[in-house]
């Protein structure tokens, strides 16, 4: 389509020390996203007892950065580790797993924990991950100081994962995207929206969007980074999966959701934004994976840094500018009727 030029702004706080690298010279193919030249930013054996860190979430904290990281232990079981950084590129990890406690202050250790997201709503930080609750299910915890991590009761029934909390309440309620599934490595999946007054009781479930007719996301999709509030709507980076004759391929897609009712998809990009191309995305424990979990973004400059897991083995970093990525999504948008349905015939 003809390029749409937007006067779009982020409705978020400035982050002047957002990690950034200018776009490389030369022709650009596809979306206006480019990789950090020193990728991967986290390599193998990043700390004692952990073989790989990948699908992980980071955010500004004070004048530095903090993150929750999926660490695959040397026994193969995933857990969540805390990390600190001055520049959001070079990370120091705490050797011990995050010590969750229940609401009575008693230790609560999930059987496993993976693919965390980290979102601040008002004055509290929330970690959302996938854990075992008679199958893959959503785990949640809250902290105000990154010292005490209080687990919140199971928000949803199994089987569900890829839960992403919105960074502010909408109409007084917490809002969360999730991806219900079956009991295995799901051969299907759509993104749904649920809301809650208290993070305990969830309801008003709405369908947001299904897998795409485009082949890159024709098997299943799932939420990625916490949505970014903009003057055009909620900017969502998500993952889409293609089923090939030789396994799954995970790419990064983009959509813009209605600001007041995020179950309505305003724009959804027909093309992938980033797909496995580099060695660290194509080769690894699970080949051909780009799995977005977080962004750091600066409202003053429009800079967006996207953090993604690569091949279930590394953490990659990519960059884009707000106006360019919104223009690209709008210019190449396809929205189907299924993207706005609430289940009424």
Question: Where are the predicted features?
Answer:
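C-terminal substrate/ligand-recognition segments
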Residues: 293, 297
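Catalytic core of Fe(II)/2-oxoglutarate
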Residues: 225
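Beta-rich carbohydrate-recognition and catalytic domains
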Residues: 3-111, 119-219, 228-288, 299-303, ...
């Amino acid at each position: 389509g003809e390029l749409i030029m937007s006067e779009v702004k982020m409705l978020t706080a400035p982050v002047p020390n957002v990690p950034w690298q200018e776009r490389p010279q030369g022709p650009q193919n596809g979306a206006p996203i480019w990789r950090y030249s020193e990728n991967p930013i986290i390599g193998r054996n990043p700390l004692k007892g952990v073989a790989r860190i990948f699908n992980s979430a980071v955010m500004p904290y004070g004048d530095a950065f903090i993150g929750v990281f999926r660490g695959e232990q040397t026994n193969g079981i995933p857990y969540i580790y805390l990390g600190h950084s001055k520049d959001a590129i070079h990370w120091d990890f705490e050797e011990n797993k995050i010590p969750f406690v229940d609401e009575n202050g008693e230790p609560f250790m999930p059987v496993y924990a993976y693919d965390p997201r980290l979102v601040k709503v008002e004055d509290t930080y929330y970690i959302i991950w996938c854990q075992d609750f008679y199958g893959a299910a959503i785990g949640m915890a809250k902290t105000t100081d990154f010292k005490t991590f209080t687990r919140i009761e199971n928000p949803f029934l199994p089987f569900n994962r890829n839960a992403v909390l919105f960074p502010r309440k909408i109409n007084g309620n917490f809002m969360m995207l999730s991806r219900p599934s079956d009991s295995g490595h799901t051969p299907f999946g759509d993104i749904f929206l649920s809301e809650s007054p208290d993070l305990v009781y969830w309801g008003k479930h709405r369908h947001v969007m299904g897998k795409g007719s485009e082949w890159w996301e024709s098997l299943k999709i799932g939420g990625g980074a916490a949505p970014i509030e903009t003057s055009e709507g909620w900017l969502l980076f998500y993952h889409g999966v293609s089923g090939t004759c030789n396994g799954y391929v995970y790419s990064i897609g983009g959509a813009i959701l209605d600001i007041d009712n995020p179950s309505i998809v305003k724009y959804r990009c027909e093309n992938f934004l980033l797909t496995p191309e580099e060695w660290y995305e194509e080769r690894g424990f699970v080949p051909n994976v780009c799995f977005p979990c977080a962004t750091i973004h600066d409202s003053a400059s429009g800079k967006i840094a996207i953090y993604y897991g690569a091949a279930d083995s590394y953490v990659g970093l990519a960059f884009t500018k707000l106006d360019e990525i919104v223009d690209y999504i709008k210019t190449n948008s396809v929205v189907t009727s299924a993207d706005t349905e609430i289940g009424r015939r």
